[in-house]
């Protein structure tokens, strides 16, 4: 990572087998693509199905409903990231100690994924100052961190701040992406006569700001701007209990995390119409009169989201004490809660941003039920040495159920079971010249399940407005447009 001098987590993926080196593009969301050939336009299943786990807690995007309804212009659509997984631009790299990318079959401990798993562990301990300055044609980055470690008390504290300012074109100061992160990580270990207690707690802030504005001098003094801000506040705590002696009980782990976001999109544009256009304002099905729009007006369209995520996990590891066979039995359960408390699409329906193509109405996101998942899992890890060989077996099963679903959904009350198995055989070691070598054959098979997001479970209703009468008169007071409005429920209750 020091060799790459990364600006975001996207750059680290160059180190993966088959990874390509390319210039960073921070003007649009960076989503991960693993186990995928090519990048089909609009196909985000791979990135949505990849789980990012930072210090033991997953990053959830299930409540992300940030999109501008009815948008068709590239300035807006190219920056949307709904149902597309984690935007890697928001992940700072300077605090990272270790990254593990699992493109095969992960442990049953990890659920709500299909494509892969990215495990990130951040640096802890030390007493050094760390700083990094980076400047190139497209971006400027500043990072400062301080580690504090009290050895007698077995306590650590790490503080860090990171700021990034990137431009798609260094000549254009009106389009830029900025990121600001702050992290405080605390760790403490207690020792008793029989057990070792360890606690790790994190407090993080991530701010991501995406701006694009057309120069008024080049746009006939017309306003045309896009502003997006993402503010995330997160807390994560991990408690571990392990015995000092080798007994049947290995460890007990508890992970708790909570995150709250304030996301806001502001799109402002001068709308100029070439013909008489109507704005539909009805929210119920039936016959209604539309509002005839002026030929020129300034439209303001905001999207407010307030995703809330809560996560809890309990793991227990057990073993049969043996000097020959290494074994670990993992038993655990986890619970995940997602809710969006934002106001959603906020705009004047009589002055729409995309006149003539609006098939939606303002909707308060807080009225959407929460998305809750409960998982249980069990896994056995076994290593058996024989005749200089070593046989490794990891086999387990995971069950996941969606809670808080209405009774008319196909997924209501059902458990989705994911059996997974990995098997490896390591042959005796040998030397090639003076170099020690070995051969290992491994394979596996398993099932993964990704649960639907809030938007997929509860999509916006579709409004179909058909013109029945269009009467034009030279006197504007006599003009009238009558519409027949159909409200189409886009909910797919047969998701499974």
Positions of predicted regions on the chain:
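Extracytoplasmic beta-strand/coil segments of soluble accessory domains associated
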Residues: 10-70
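N-terminal periplasmic accessory domains that precede
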Residues: 12, 31-33, 53, 85-89, ...
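Hydrophobic, lipid-facing positions within transmembrane beta-strands of outer-membrane proteins
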Residues: 48, 116, 140-144, 178-184, ...
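Short acidic/polar hinge/loop motifs at secondary-structure boundaries
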Residues: 57-102
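Transmembrane beta-barrel wall of Gram-negative outer-membrane proteins
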Residues: 130-165, 172-255, 259
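Transmembrane beta-strands of outer-membrane beta-barrel pores
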Residues: 135-139, 150, 161-167, 203-211, ...
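Face-selective signature of the C-terminal outer-membrane beta-barrel domain
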Residues: 190-208, 226-409
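Structural signature of Gram-negative outer-membrane beta-barrels, strongest in the C-terminal barrel
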Residues: 367-496
């Amino acid at each position: 990572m020091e060799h790459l001098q990364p600006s975001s987590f996207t750059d680290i993926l160059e180190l993966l087998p088959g990874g390509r080196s390319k210039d960073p593009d921070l003007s649009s969301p960076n989503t991960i693509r693993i186990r995928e050939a090519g990048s089909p336009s609009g196909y985000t299943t791979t990135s949505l199905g990849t789980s990012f786990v930072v210090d033991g807690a997953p990053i959830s995007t299930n409540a992300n409903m940030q999109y501008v309804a009815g948008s068709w212009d590239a300035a807006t659509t190219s920056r949307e990231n709904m149902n597309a997984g984690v935007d890697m631009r928001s992940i700072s790299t300077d605090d990272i100690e270790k990254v593990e990318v699992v493109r095969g079959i992960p442990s049953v401990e990890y659920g709500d994924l299909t494509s892969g798993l990215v495990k990130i562990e951040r640096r802890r301990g030390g007493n050094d100052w760390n700083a990094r300055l980076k400047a190139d044609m497209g971006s400027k980055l500043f990072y400062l961190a301080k580690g504090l470690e009290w050895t007698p008390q077995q306590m650590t504290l790490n503080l860090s701040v990171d700021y990034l300012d990137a431009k798609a074109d260094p000549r254009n100061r009106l389009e830029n992406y900025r990121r600001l992160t702050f992290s405080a990580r605390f760790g403490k270990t207690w020792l008793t006569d029989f057990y070792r207690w360890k606690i790790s707690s994190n407090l993080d802030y991530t701010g991501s700001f995406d701006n694009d504005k057309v120069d008024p001098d080049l746009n006939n003094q017309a306003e045309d701007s896009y502003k997006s801000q993402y503010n995330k506040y997160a807390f994560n705590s991990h408690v571990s209990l392990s015995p000092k002696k080798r007994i049947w009980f290995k460890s007990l782990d508890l992970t708790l995390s909570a995150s709250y976001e304030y996301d806001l999109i502001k799109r402002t544009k001068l709308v100029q119409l070439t013909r008489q256009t109507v704005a539909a304002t009805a929210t119920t099905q039936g016959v209604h009169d539309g509002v005839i729009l002026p030929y020129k007006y300034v439209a303001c369209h905001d999207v407010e989201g307030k995703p809330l995520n809560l996560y809890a996990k309990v793991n227990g590891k057990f073993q049969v004490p043996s000097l020959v066979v290494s074994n670990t039995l993992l038993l655990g359960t986890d619970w995940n809660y997602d809710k969006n408390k934002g106001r959603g699409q906020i705009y004047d329906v009589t002055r729409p941003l995309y006149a003539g193509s609006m098939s939606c109405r303002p909707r308060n996101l807080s009225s959407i039920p929460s998305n809750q998942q409960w998982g249980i899992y069990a896994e056995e890890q076994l290593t058996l040495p024989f005749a200089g060989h070593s046989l490794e077996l990891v086999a387990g099963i995971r069950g996941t159920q969606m809670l808080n679903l209405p009774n008319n959904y196909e997924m209501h009350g059902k458990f989705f079971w994911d059996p997974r198995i990995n098997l490896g055989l390591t042959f005796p070691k040998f030397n090639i010249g003076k170099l020690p070598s070995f051969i290992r054959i491994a394979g596996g098979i398993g099932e993964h399940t990704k649960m639907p997001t809030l938007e997929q479970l509860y999509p916006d209703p579709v409004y179909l407005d058909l013109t029945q009468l269009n009467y034009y008169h030279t006197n504007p007071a006599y003009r009238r447009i009558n519409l027949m409005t159909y409200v189409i429920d886009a909910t797919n209750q047969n998701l499974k």
